[in-house]
Amino acid sequence: MPPSGLRLLPLLLPLPWLLVLTPGRPAAGLSTCKTIDMELVKRKRIEAIRGQILSKLRLASPPSQGEVPPGPLPEAVLALYNSTRDRVAGESADPEPEPEADYYAKEVTRVLMVDRNNAIYEKTKDISHSIYMFFNTSDIREAVPEPPLLSRAELRLQRLKSSVEQHVELYQKYSNNSWRYLGNRLLTPTDTPEWLSFDVTGVVRQWLNQGDGIQGFRFSAHCSCDSKDNKLHVEINGISPKRRGDLGTIHDMNRPFLLLMATPLERAQHLHSSRHRRALDTNYCFSSTEKNCCVRQLYIDFRKDLGWKWIHEPKGYHANFCLGPCPYIWSLDTQYSKVLALYNQHNPGASASPCCVPQALEPLPIVYYVGRKPKVEQLSNMIVRSCKCS
């Protein structure tokens, strides 16, 4: 028995001595990440997604299915969903980190251009070098009550098939019949109709700040000093001569429109808190014997995995998750024992070693019903595309 007041110091030495005796080797044994079997990982990911979707839609529980109309979705709603899905598919798989305001779901709205029979188009009918598209800002304001709520606005035009290559330009209508240049594009020959998309977020935000009225865009042939042919050879659905019967309906439905994504006013009041977002998105710290931190595939079927019938499109999606070890190096040049002790003191539930976490995430467009009204919304950060050690 040691005398009273004395301690056996050797008991405190093994960890530092191990670090000194094994310089340059991974300290995998020091990780506080727990080994979790794959099925448990998947179950936790599914439950996290259940909470994410309800939270992003500001729903305390899944909507009732009792009043949902039977049959397929209305054509206009399906067209809006398809437009949103196509836009997401066309974006980069490695987006910039989204600001906190992008946590909540965005309501997606389609605002059609003013009908071609409106008198505002009278002065533009005989112009061959341009086509004109006008929008009523009161329609836009219905979807976006306040300019800061607007997340993104796109002008979408359906170009009909063409055998001609042409350089085109887009302009924004200013006061006193002046036009502001926005951008250009080279259109190559195509055998099928194709959608053209232009980012006009800043323009629409400007319109919302100016008040109600009629605003518009001009889509023109590039004017070259070397060419005498300034005629626009591009046909746009909804602007070229109207078809009859069913073709006329499709023609009208596909006329140019603004695709608006905005945070609903009631959700904007909850943007001050970011803790809830982090708790849902990065609550788990994984480590296993698998090689490398990387994306693991996980498909979620809304009916089978979540027991939900209220999401009409899509039926499911590849949510994916991150898994794999993240070793780091301990050596004589990197004495982290004091820092590690301090870190553990202030973060008792956190991992002492790097963990495999999502790096790039993509949004998920959905169609669901509120009562008997179908809604199209875009849920941010729902699909894991790449992972990193952090």
UniProtKB/Swiss-Prot annotation:
GO aspect biological process, one term: hyaluronan catabolic process
Entry protein name: Transforming growth factor beta-1 proprotein
Query: What does the UniProt function comment say about this protein?
Result: Transforming growth factor beta-1 proprotein: Precursor of the Latency-associated peptide (LAP) and Transforming growth factor beta-1 (TGF-beta-1) chains, which constitute the regulatory and active subunit of TGF-beta-1, respectively.
Residue segments, region Arm domain: 75-271
Q: Which cysteines are joined by disulfide bonds?
A: 285-294, 293-356, 322-387, 326-389
A GO cellular component entry from the record: extracellular matrix
Keyword Glycoprotein assigned to the entry: answer is yes
Q: Subunit info?
A: Homodimer; disulfide-linked. Interacts with the serine proteases, HTRA1 and HTRA3: the interaction with either inhibits TGFB1-mediated signaling and the HTRA protease activity is required for this inhibition. May interact with THSD4; this interaction may lead to sequestration by FBN1 microfibril assembly and attenuation of TGFB signaling. Interacts with CD109, DPT and ASPN. Interacts with EFEMP2. Interacts with TSKU; the interaction contributes to regulation of the hair cycle. Interacts with TGFBR3.
User: Per the record, which residues fall in region Bowtie tail?
Assistant: 226-252
Q: Which UniProt keywords apply?
A: Cleavage on pair of basic residues, Disulfide bond, Extracellular matrix, Glycoprotein, Growth factor, Mitogen, Secreted, Signal
Annotated tissue distribution: Expressed in cardiomyocytes. Weakly expressed in the mammary glands, with a slight increase of expression following onset of involution.
Give the similarity note: Belongs to the TGF-beta family.
Glycosylated residues in this chain:
82, 136, 176
Q: Which Gene3D superfamilies match?
A: 2.60.120.970, Cystine-knot cytokines (2.10.90.10)
Q: What Gene Ontology molecular function terms does this protein carry? A: cytokine activity; deubiquitinase activator activity; enzyme binding; growth factor activity; identical protein binding; protein serine/threonine kinase activator activity; protein-containing complex binding; transforming growth factor beta receptor binding
User: Does the record's keyword annotation contain Ion transport?
Assistant: no
